[in-house]
Amino acid sequence: IMNMLIIGNEIHVKNKEGLEKMLNELKIKYKFGHISEIDKYDIIYHPSQAIDTSKYPNKKFIFGPHFSTFPTNKLLDIKNVHNNSVYIQPSIWSKEIWEPHIKKINLPIKVFSFPVNTEKFKPDKKIEERDRIFIYFKRRNPHELLLLIDFCKKKNIIPFVFDYVKRYNEEDYLDCLKNAKFGIILDAHESQGFAIEEALSCNVPLLVWNVKTMNQEYRSTYRELSCTSVPYWDERCGEIFYNIKELEDTFKIFIEKLHTYEPRKYIEENLSVEKCGKKLETLIKDIK
């Protein structure tokens, strides 16, 4: 039986919860500990700091995804001479941003997402029994939010607004999801996007005003790098548009198809503890 040492306390709370669930599923013993304990463990995971792995030829190392949004020279300190290390990014687009930089150093980069809590975020009402509509707003231009609210008004919709930057209570969000007919997403780049995935897990169809580039984040200094708000998505989840001019037509299609979407199925097939756990098992196996 393998065991894992998890170092550092910078792990995102949702990642931590998902990681523990996966390790339990795989029957891998684990401990949140210190670099001085490496000798006692088979697999070492550090989400946010480099470790010189050249000192530990017989261990397996997993790093990321919390080093930084963009490639960082911190990775140079990993020194993967034994080919026993891997860096993880939660989605394809975020991996692609790192790849050109990481090619210069001997460190494989793999797409690995953390699971959604499908037990907590699960529906208990059919869509026809739900009556709420919400907007999830995160780091986009406030003018765009006003355009959406104005559009809703014309459709006689009064949406609940969850503003990521202003913070909100997760229990309120969960309560809304359980009672939501649909949600509208106004978000910038997401490499994982837990709040969106949690809505899908509650079987809430989503209408997404998506981004194409990172500089669409409000007041950001990012370059025009390709990205998305919904890295985990297929046609069962809802509809996507990119420009306010497309909203009316996309909304019409979305409402017509509202009862046909199956977002929870998508989550169960791609982001459940079991599915992500299998990917973790493969990730570990593939480290030499």
Regions found by a protein language model. Name each.
Residues 1-55, 278-283, 288:
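N-terminal pre-catalytic "stem/leader" segment of glycosyltransferase-like enzymes
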Residues 42-72, 86-89:
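Active-site proximal beta-strand in glycosyltransferases
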Residues 76-85:
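A conserved, positively charged/aromatic
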Residues 84-107, 142-144:
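A short, active-site helix/loop in glycosyltransferases that binds the activated sugar's phosphate group
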Residues 97-100, 116-173:
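Conserved catalytic-core segment of nucleotide-activated headgroup transferases in glycan assembly
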Residues 169-180, 201:
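Short acidic alpha-helix that forms the nucleotide-activated donor recognition element
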Residues 178-191:
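Acidic donor-binding loop of glycosyltransferase active sites
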Residues 191-270:
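Catalytic binding pocket for nucleotide-activated donors in carbohydrate/polymer assembly enzymes
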